[in-house]
Amino acid sequence: MKVFKFIGLMILLTSAFSAGSGQSPMTVLCSIDWFMVTVHPFMLNNDVCVHFHELHLGLGCPPNHVQPHAYQFTYRVTECGIRAKAVSQDMVIYSTEIHYSSKGTPSKFVIPVSCAAPQKSPWLTKPCSMRVASKSRATAQKDEKCYEVFSLSQSSQRPNCDCPPCVFSEEEHTQVPCHQAGAQEAQPLQPSHFLDISEDWSLHTDDMIGSM
């Protein structure tokens, strides 16, 4: 009960911060398999532009999708030293840090980032035009926008594309082609769960419950 009260308090504080700043400098999204952090170049203040090469996630993971208005880190929850804590049978909290080291000044910052995800949730990414390679799956017409879905069963597969992971055929292990995200306008992602918690969590095997 205390855990859920704490989560509710942090959501309230996060909402208040976003409303006060006018634009959220950082967004954290996650699923049971993936962790995504989107950072605004003016994350510190309006006078300091942070360059993407001055940032890394966790244990040295650089942003893997850079745009003029945002830097995005998208990694598996088993990478970059991301920590996990099962707070219930249905909910896991993932946490790590964004490290900033200025190239022109001695300034350094460590910003904790966390996100809560249900243990059986799929990850829905932004629409991405694709052709489905497997006949056993629903097919999409050329240039039709489809939502990519991936979950824990595909965690052993690593697609090679710019956008977050494409759909794989589990029967044929065939990768669905995915257009690079840079060819599309950035569209806001709709998180099913959003949370930013500064408390440090550590991963213990015994904590991972049930379907983990």
Curated annotation (Swiss-Prot):
Induction: Up-regulated during trophoblast differentiation and by FGF7 in trophoblast cells. This is Placenta-specific protein 1. Expressed in placenta. Localizes primarily to differentiated syncytiotrophoblast throughout gestation as well as to a small population of villous cytotrophoblasts. Also detected in maternal blood and rapidly disappears following delivery, but is not detected in other adult or fetal tissues examined. Residues 1-22 form the signal peptide. May play a role in placental development. Belongs to the PLAC1 family. It is found in: Secreted. InterPro entries: PLAC1_fam. One of its GO terms (biological process) is placenta development. It comes from the Eukaryota. GO terms for cellular component: extracellular region. Keywords: Developmental protein, Secreted, Signal.
